[in-house]
């Protein structure tokens, strides 16, 4: 079997009107991932609805409601090949109420392409654009490129492109901690395909790469094999003649038969007998592998979903409390000390209490706006101290980022998201 190309997850972010979905649709079409007949059909459908020019976007906007409104709601995943990678595109929604999807989407991204409208040079940077870039930075995405879209509306003017490039660099990227000098800016007209997959003849002044070439230049994610073993449990089975078989995805480190392991917060200790993936035994498993494994000395009743496996020499951290940086996405009123919503981190769902609201931050820059505020509302970013109501494994993002991020849910919606910056470990 031919070795498949490495997979690279790329998030497309930016304001709702910048043309993200059209850019993605064009990449998929010119990259050979979509049947051109589909575009012809969608173009007809778009014109009938008075949305001419939306045909590429329709490829990503799979949901019917999105087509009617022309808005991307859920996180859509599509693939296309470049010279180097099999690229999975995470098309992140642009609307305020959909930032929670952005958080679940961006956390899977290895790199991001920010799509901006060249016209923003006149109207200023959209708040949503700031928020998206801040969020991907917060979520640990370090590789970024900028597609300056709708160049056809300014006759492919180099001056307009340079003006926007300077504004995005000075007023956005530098403030958030990206170095504009190290970021590729690409002038594109996604609807017509200029500089998306193919070089444009209409930008003779631009000598740089196309969007597809920029994506090829991103670095593949390093598998965190050098970090301590962490494997959140998704399910536990008891198989006759085999014994207890937990299943889950290796987040960090390496697991192999013979390893002495501990499940936290359960405290159960055992030894790995076999490791399997897709019904085949493996000599070892690494980050990204979804595995089942047989463990000696641990019964089905001893462990459950939400427990995290690690080596006995470096057990997962059980938090008595933790300090976190959060962004409040939506809440009908305000968050105050004592609020106890459910935290979703790795496979665990555990209620945690807001013990202190230490600082309110500017969500676009991270600077401190207020010490010890009385409350937080939608749109605020903050540093807070949290106390789990039950034992829970969470790691500091500095130590093991894969186990440091969480979403906060209440009333059937994601009210906030964030990451643990300091964890007080329970005494073993």
From Swiss-Prot:
Residues 149-152 are annotated as: G4. PANTHER family: TRANSLATION FACTOR. It is an enzyme of class 3 (hydrolase). Belongs to the TRAFAC class translation factor GTPase superfamily. Classic translation factor GTPase family. EF-Tu/EF-1A subfamily. The keyword Cytoplasm applies. It comes from the Archaea. This is Elongation factor 1-alpha. It comes from Methanococcus vannielii (strain ATCC 35089 / DSM 1224 / JCM 13029 / OCM 148 / SB).
């Amino acid at each position: 079997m031919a070795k498949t190309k490495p997979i690279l997850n790329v998030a497309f972010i930016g304001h709702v009107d910048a043309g993200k979905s059209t850019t993605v649709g064009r990449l998929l079409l010119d990259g050979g991932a979509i049947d051109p007949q589909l575009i012809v059909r969608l173009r007809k459908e778009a014109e009938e609805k008075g949305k001419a020019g939306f045909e590429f976007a329709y490829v990503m906007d799979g949901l019917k409601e999105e087509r009617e409104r022309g808005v991307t709601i859920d996180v859509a995943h599509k693939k296309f090949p470049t010279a180097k990678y099999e690229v999975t595109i995470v098309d992140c929604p642009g609307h305020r109420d959909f930032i929670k999807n952005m958080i679940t989407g961006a956390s899977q991204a290895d790199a991001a392409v920010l799509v901006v409208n060249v016209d923003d040079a006149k109207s200023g940077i959209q708040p949503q654009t700031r928020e998206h870039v801040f969020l991907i930075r917060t979520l640990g995405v370090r590789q970024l490129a900028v597609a300056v879209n709708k160049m056809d509306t300014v006759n492919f003017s180099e001056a307009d492109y340079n003006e926007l490039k300077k504004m995005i660099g000075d007023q956005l990227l530098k403030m958030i901690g990206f170095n504009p000098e190290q970021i590729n800016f690409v002038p594109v007209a996604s609807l017509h395909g200029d500089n998306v997959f193919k070089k444009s003849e209409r930008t003779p002044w631009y000598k740089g790469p196309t969007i597809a070439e920029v994506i090829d230049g991103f670095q593949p994610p390093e598998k965190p094999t050098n970090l301590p073993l962490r494997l959140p449990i998704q399910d536990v089975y008891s198989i006759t003649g085999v014994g207890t078989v937990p299943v889950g995805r290796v987040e960090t480190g390496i697991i192999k038969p013979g390893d002495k392991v501990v499940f936290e917060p359960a405290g159960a200790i055992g030894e790995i007998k076999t490791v399997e993936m897709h019904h085949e035994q493996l000599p070892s498993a690494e980050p990204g592998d979804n595995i089942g494994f047989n463990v000696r000395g641990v019964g089905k009743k001893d462990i459950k979903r939400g427990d995290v496996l690690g080596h006995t020499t470096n057990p997962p951290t059980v938090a008595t409390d933790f300090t976190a940086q959060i962004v409040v996405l939506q809440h009908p009123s305000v968050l105050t000390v004592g609020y106890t919503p459910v935290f979703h981190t790795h496979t665990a769902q555990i209620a945690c209490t807001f013990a202190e609201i230490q600082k309110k931050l500017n969500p676009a820059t991270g600077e401190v706006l207020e010490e010890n505020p009385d409350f937080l509302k939608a749109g605020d970013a903050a540093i807070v101290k949290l106390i789990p109501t039950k034992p829970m494994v969470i790691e500091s993002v500095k130590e093991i980022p894969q186990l440091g991020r969480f979403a906060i849910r209440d009333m059937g919606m994601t009210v906030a998201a964030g990451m643990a910056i300091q964890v007080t470990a329970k005494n073993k």
